[in-house]
């Protein structure tokens, strides 16, 4: 499968509204999901835009394919940024569950391959600025949508 030029990929776009104080504009495409809890996703960010503030609840690996991915690690207790890492094309990372962070595309956006392994059905939790859970990505819901053809 060509991840760079593939008109058959189905993209789901996410944009923020006035309730967020940072620009949200990114898309996700489900590449693969297996009964053993593994999920492969391709994400792309618009230039200088974020995805939702979140915590991974699954074991996660990622590889930047194009552009830059700016990752801000956040202290969940204080909300302060602990560090910022700029990942460039070719950069690979592996994280255990629990990592709280913000991600945004660089000046030209970003294209990133994510490989997750669900633990207890959960993949990630979207968070408000104060750390309150405002949404959750669940393995069984994604699997059901895939089987239904959505």
Spell out what each predicted region is:
Residues 39-56, 77, 87, 96-98:
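Conserved short histidine dyad/triad with adjacent acidic residue
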Residues 55-57, 105-108:
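Short glycine/proline-enriched turns and hinge-like loops at secondary-structure junctions
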Residues 35, 75-106:
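Short acidic-glycine-tyrosine-enriched beta hairpin
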Residues 94, 107-125:
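A short hydrophobic beta-strand segment most commonly corresponding to one strand
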